[in-house]
């Protein structure tokens, strides 16, 4: 298949890379054979207040599960992102901020960011926040979001960042679960030209009858818009900062003390609070950031993720700042007001490393490469992809149009639960294949198992599990350790179950086939939906595709494809048949879609993830009880898909 084409490491990257292929293999082998020794060495890449002597104490036994790393050491995450850089790099840019409107620009040096964080840490203390308290952060993409997180870490409070697109009900459930004492927000946010009513959403969330834990709401003035004000509860960020001291000694935290909570989106039932602790997480975030992106001193690094997602935590705040990087933060979306915005920002800020999501790449691809005719891109050296498997066609477009065929692409696979990247190419070490996450990071032992838990060897496919712990791993589900054990360690005993399916090819490269519940069983054959989607998107008239299974009288499950065409393409029955033949040719007769529904848009969360549970229900003609759609960017998309569905009962 065309997906097997190999892209060699560019010679100019190989010449200066942190590790080459031989070094990767040697380091990886050491990390698996001698994890104690390996992580003892690399655990010292960050600053410890009391150095650790104990490295690893972990068990994946579901009757006696525990995960501890560097567990007798003490440190502070904020000090590792700020104080350690002050002696030599106080004047170096830590943050470059560009607003939704490109005319809004701000910068903060490491010295300035340190001062802001210390002041806000003292402000939090003045409002009664103490070590171990949970603070909810519901902010736009402004530097103050990072300041709030680092200030919490400085005083030992646990931050719980909620994505600024979430509904009041979603906020309320997270505030209740975390028992938050203080909420930090802004009057309004600005995103793609639209005003986001952040404070109004908080007011509504806190009016929920079960929310009785919040004592204070700190409000940053972003737009100056009119907002409701609750005397005695609400307080302006600015007025707190006016009187706060710039001196704040970082709290000495145990390596296993909590750093943050982050609730996984899209899960059914109660929100699942993923708990990450301080020591192992900081080591892993910093190390993966440096090695996966081959980070060099003085480079400008842009991760387009929102701070409300794990990618924003690990690869916009903690990892890059621990490494002393200059981080670009963008308030808006990289294809507003025009698709050219991404390229304009890369050129304007001389971005060296770009980390973005397949959903954005596909959106830009649908607009056409002529949008990038004025794009120079000469500053770019490394490009990354995150969030979901990237279609080979989108990978190639990213490589050709954005990377000008000179930038290695690191297609990273990981999860909220893993804290950092688990499987990814390393720019100077790994020849890449479009659509493959390739090889495991140091210390990570992936395996494939069949449905009863037997490990399958060689070129094969199955359920993706991890056989041993790594420092960035989540420690528990907040307040519900039994749920942690049940979700991740009961399905396959003694292994961490990722919930993803994967294929390993003859070179040992891993291909993520999607969530296991995104596997279709057609006439007894397992088929990853990502594979069918990739084939559809490879057609020149297809901008995006989502594939699900639906009940089929003969096959058990049939293949139902939702297809969005490129601009200007016409939806015809001839094209529908052409696409069916196209997939048949690309993958085989088994993968031919039974039904292809034209879709002007797909139901996505505001982070761009397709909400497949809605698509599965519509395909199954179960349209009366679709469940909560509050996390969707555009709920109206659902109504249109229901109206135009193909699998109606007669």
Curated annotation (Swiss-Prot):
- PROSITE patterns, A to Z: AMP_BINDING
Organism phylogeny: Bacteria, Pseudomonadati, Pseudomonadota, Gammaproteobacteria, Alteromonadales
Keywords attached to this Swiss-Prot or TrEMBL record, sorted alphabetically, are: Acetylation, ATP-binding, Ligase, Magnesium, Metal-binding, Nucleotide-binding
Q: Report the Gene3D superfamilies cross-referenced here.
A: 3.30.300.30, N-terminal domain of ligase-like
Name of the gene: acsA
Provide the protein name. Answer: Acetyl-coenzyme A synthetase
Q: Which organism is it from?
A: Shewanella pealeana (strain ATCC 700345 / ANG-SQ1)
Q: Which family does it belong to?
A: Belongs to the ATP-dependent AMP-binding enzyme family.
Q: Which positions bind ATP?
A: 387-389, 411-416, 500, 515, 526
User: Which Cys-Cys disulfides exist here?
Assistant: none
* Post-translational modifications: Acetylated. Deacetylation by the SIR2-homolog deacetylase activates the enzyme.
A GO molecular function annotation here is: metal ion binding
UniProt-listed SUPFAM superfamilies: Acetyl-CoA synthetase-like
Tell me yes or no: is Kinase among this UniProt entry's keywords.
no
Query: Which residues are the signal sequence here?
Result: none
């Amino acid at each position: 298949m065309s997906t097997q084409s190999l892209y060699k490491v560019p010679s100019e990257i190989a010449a200066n890379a942190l590790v080459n292929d031989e070094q990767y293999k040697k380091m990886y082998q050491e990390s698996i054979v001698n994890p104690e020794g390996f992580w003892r060495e690399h655990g010292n890449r960050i600053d410890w207040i009391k150095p650790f002597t104990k490295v690893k104490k972990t068990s994946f036994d579901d009757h006696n599960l525990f995960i501890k790393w560097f567990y007798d050491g003490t440190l502070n995450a904020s000090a590792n992102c700020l104080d350690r850089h002050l002696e030599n790099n106080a004047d170096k840019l830590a943050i470059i901020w560009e607003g939704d409107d490109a005319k809004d620009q701000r910068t903060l040096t490491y010295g300035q960011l340190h001062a802001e964080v210390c002041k806000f840490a003292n402000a939090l203390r003045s409002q009664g926040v103490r070590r171990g308290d949970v603070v909810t952060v519901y902010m736009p993409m402004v530097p103050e979001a990072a300041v709030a997180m680092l200030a919490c870490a400085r005083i030992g409070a646990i931050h719980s960042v909620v994505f600024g697109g979430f509904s009041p009900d979603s906020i309320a459930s997270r505030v209740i679960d975390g028992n938050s004492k203080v909420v930090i927000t802004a009057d309004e946010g600005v995103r793609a030209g639209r005003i986001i009513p952040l404070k109004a959403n908080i007011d509504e969330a806190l009016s929920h009858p079960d929310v009785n834990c919040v004592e204070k709401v700190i409000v940053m003035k972003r737009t100056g818009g009119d907002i409701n004000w609750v005397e005695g509860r609400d307080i302006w960020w600015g007025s707190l900062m006016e009187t706060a001291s710039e001196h704040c000694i970082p709290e000495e935290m145990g390596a296993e003390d909590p750093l943050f909570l982050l609730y996984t989106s899209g899960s059914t039932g109660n929100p699942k609070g993923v708990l990450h602790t301080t020591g192992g997480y900081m080591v892993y975030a910093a190390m993966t950031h440096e090695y996966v992106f081959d980070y060099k001193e003085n480079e400008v690094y842009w991760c387009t993720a929102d701070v409300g997602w794990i990618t924003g935590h690990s690869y916009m705040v903690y990892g890059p700042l621990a490494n002393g990087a200059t981080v670009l933060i963008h308030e808006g979306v990289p294809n507003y007001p025009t698709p050219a915005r991404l390229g304009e920002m890369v050129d304007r800020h001389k971005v060296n490393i770009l980390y973005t999501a397949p959903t954005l790449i596909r959106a830009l691809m649908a607009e056409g490469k002529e949008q990038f005719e004025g794009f120079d891109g000469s500053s770019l050296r490394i490009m990354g992809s995150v969030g979901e498997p990237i279609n080979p066609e989108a990978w190639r477009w990213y490589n050709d149009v954005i990377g000008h065929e000179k930038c290695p692409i690191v297609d990273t696979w990981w999860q909220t639960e893993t804290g950092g990247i688990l499987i990814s190419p390393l720019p100077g070490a790994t020849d890449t294949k479009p659509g493959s996450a390739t090889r495991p990071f140091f210390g990570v032992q992936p395996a494939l198992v069949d449905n009863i838990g037997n490990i399958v060897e060689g070129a094969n496919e199955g359920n993706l599990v991890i056989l041993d712990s790594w420092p960035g791993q989540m420690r528990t589900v907040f307040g519900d350790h039994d749920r942690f054990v049940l979700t991740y360690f009961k399905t396959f005993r003694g292994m961490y179950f990722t919930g993803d399916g994967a294929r390993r090819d003859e070179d040992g490269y891993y291909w993520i086939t999607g969530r296991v519940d995104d596997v279709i069983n057609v006439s007894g054959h397992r088929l990853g939906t990502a594979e069918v989607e990739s084939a559809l998107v490879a057609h020149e008239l297809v901008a995006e595709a989502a594939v699900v299974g639906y009940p089929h009288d003969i096959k058990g499950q049939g293949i139902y494809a939702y297809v969005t065409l490129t601009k200007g393409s016409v939806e015809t029955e001839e094209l529908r048949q052409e696409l069916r033949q196209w997939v048949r040719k690309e993958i085989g007769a088994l993968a031919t879609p039974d039904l292809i529904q034209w879709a002007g848009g797909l139901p996505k969360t505001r982070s761009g993830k397709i909400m497949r549970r809605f698509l599965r229900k519509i395909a199954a003609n179960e349209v009366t009880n679709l469940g909560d759609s509050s996390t969707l960017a555009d709920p109206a998309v659902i109504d249109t898909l229901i109206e135009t569905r193909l699998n109606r009962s007669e």
